[in-house]
Amino acid sequence: VKFRQLGDSQIGVSEISLGSWLTYGGGVGQEQTEACTRAAFDAGINFFDTANVYGGGAAETVWGEVLKGFDRGSYVLATKVFFPMSETDRGLSREQIHKQIDASLRRLQTDYVDLYQCHRPDPETPIEETMEALTEVCEAGKAREIGFSEWTVEQIEAGLEVPNARKFVSSQPQYNMIWRAPEAELIPFCEQHGISQIVWSPLAQGVLTGKYAPGKPPPEDSRAASAEMNWAMDRY
């Protein structure tokens, strides 16, 4: 496994990361999560990405149990904030960012995350408030760096222009050989500003592995065969 720097930061990450959407804390239990995590470590992967909303917090909880068995300095841990955790807990306000980072750290059983990401933009909160809150999280030692997922170039630019705010080091768009829209504007803009790409769905939920055939049922041991997880396949 090769390694790269995460944007303009000092964080070195493996080119391949292990994510947890649709799996850990949902259709995949702790025993299998631990097996996957150990296999990732054995392969040289040091980058693990999750989000508070995955499994309603369950993905972070399961990984917290699994990762506490590894030296904290041996891996890079990323999580996210934005989507609803309850009817009233959502968004990127100062209150929510501080509340949700603390909740994520408790579930993950760690004092800090290496990367804290805005899971989506929040049009209801001034960008200045969001960026200031993210900066406060970093200054408090609860996150080393910040990033975003699925922001437009205009939204990224607005965040970068907030005075004295922490700068983004990562972008997480959907990007794979089927969906290449980020190549038009997002990736070139990020390259100019020292922002790395951490893509989600790089294998299009497994479609690009070749294990799913048109008109045939999915393999029994695949996520697409699970009633808990096959809804994500509808887009393909």
Which role does the model predict for each range below?
Residues I11-I16, G44-N46, D71-Y75, Q109-D114, ...:
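Short, well-ordered coil/turn segments that N-cap beta-strands
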Residues S20-E31, V81-H98, H119-T125:
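Active-site mouth loops of central-metabolism enzymes
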Residues G25-V28, A51-E60, P84-M85, D122-P126, ...:
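Acidic-and-aromatic substrate-binding clefts and catalytic sites of carbohydrate-active enzymes
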Residues G27-A40, G91-Q109, E154-L160:
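Short, acidic/polar
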